[in-house]
Amino acid sequence: MDWKSMLRTGVHKPGALTAGLSVFLTLVYVLNWVFPINEKILLDPGALRKLQLTRLSLYPLAHLSIFHLLLNLMSLFVPLSMFEASHGTVFTGITLNLLAIVTGVVYCLVGMLLYPNVYVGGASGWCFTLCGYFAVQEAGFRPHYELASLKMPTLYIPLVFLVLVTLLMPGSSFVGHLIGLGLGYLIGFRERWLQMATPPGWLIVKIETWLDRWISMIPSVVKYHRESSVDRTAGYTPLYQESELPLHNDNFPGQGRVLGP
């Protein structure tokens, strides 16, 4: 499965978790206009010391502006749907929660020393984690991408995005994004560690069996990826097939490739 086919209506339905999370993030943002939700879930560097578990796990749901929300939704939708399709809906949900907690803990440990009064929120940490993860997977097939005479190592492309986001949006959390990206690289290189930190597949299958009645009620416009239908050991399919990559130029003696989508 490639990312472009997911954007073609009717070819691949978005994952149930991906679609549901997009709706839920939007709902939380709207409800925050009426109820002070963000005040309760924004990540405070002192949350770890105060054992505020709500802040440590729910801060990705908080968004400070409509631009912040839309940017994260657009950045998250395709890579998360790809990850969900290859790893399963429940497994992906557990992974997101685990990533939020680990990122939050590391952010607090650093923040208590460097920025004790800086609160953060938003799903951009997940975006950078997925970006790092897929960069590692893609680099195994294509170590470099070329644009004109510029050759960019595939593994470094997320770092370029990180720098650009930091420069264009100076109010964003560089440390939070860096932690998220680092976790993405870690999962990409050591995905077995993620498997060890999550419930075994047989348990997820059992839970899905218990919840089968409710799972069957999920609208058909999205796809629920059951644990029994995914194979997390299957090989990765690169974003671009080799036949899609060449960009010929009579004035350029080599072969060019598009950078990114």
Curated annotation (Swiss-Prot):
Chief place of localization: Golgi
Gene Ontology MF terms: serine-type endopeptidase activity
Chemical reaction(s) catalysed: Cleaves type-1 transmembrane domains using a catalytic dyad composed of serine and histidine that are contributed by different transmembrane domains
PANTHER family: RHOMBOID PROTEIN 2 (PTHR43066:SF1), RHOMBOID-RELATED PROTEIN (PTHR43066)
E.C. code: 3.4.21.105
Cell inner membrane found in the keyword field: no
UniProt record, GO biological process: proteolysis
SUPFAM superfamilies: Rhomboid-like
Keyword line: Golgi apparatus, Hydrolase, Membrane, Protease, Serine protease, Transmembrane, Transmembrane helix
Gene Ontology CC entries for this record: Golgi membrane; nuclear periphery
Active-site residue list: 124, 177
Family label: Belongs to the peptidase S54 family.
Cellular localization per UniProt: Golgi apparatus membrane; Golgi apparatus, cis-Golgi network membrane
Membrane spanning residue stretches: 17-37, 58-78, 94-114, 116-136, 155-175
Natural source organism: Eremothecium gossypii (strain ATCC 10895 / CBS 109.51 / FGSC 9923 / NRRL Y-1056)
Function: Probable rhomboid-type serine protease that catalyzes intramembrane proteolysis.
Keyword Membrane carried by entry: yes
Name this polypeptide is given: Rhomboid-type serine protease 2
Membrane-related topology note: Multi-pass membrane protein
Enzyme class, spelled out: hydrolase
